[in-house]
Amino acid sequence: MDFSRNLYDIGEQLDSEDLASLKFLSLDYIPQRKQEPIKDALMLFQRLQEKRMLEESNLSFLKELLFRINRLDLLITYLNTRKEEMERELQTPGRAQISAYRVMLYQISEEVSRSELRSFKFLLQEEISKCKLDDDMNLLDIFIEMEKRVILGEGKLDILKRVCAQINKSL
């Protein structure tokens, strides 16, 4: 298996939404300010290699990222890993490299509809100024902004819980 070639092929198949998701899930390893210049998957892979989170001999973080964003096609085709293998692997204590907190936020963002996103922005106006909540901002961007303002974190879920409860109890 040609490591660089596989990374290139994977990167070519990831769209901007996939990239935004991968960047969000990598925030615990690559801080936001270091992510700003990342414009494509290859740049992200390069940063992950610099952090030793992605190596030819250790693809577990990349596999977990692709699994979390539900790109099972890439997992199977390029990394020869099935969904069941990943589920088993991530059940083992200490194996998951992406925090449960980050995964939870990502899952919420995947479940929120457009109208619920508008409600989210409306309900957060007091905490985040309107100009920061522009129209093209997605929920992952909002979570990042909330983290910057220290109103969201692993131990700070009150505002998120309140807003989710107001919008949709199933969140």
Language model feature labels by segment:
Residues 6-10, 21-171:
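Alpha-helical death-domain superfamily interaction modules
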Residues 1-3:
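Plant-biased recognition of short, low-complexity, intrinsically disordered N-terminal tails
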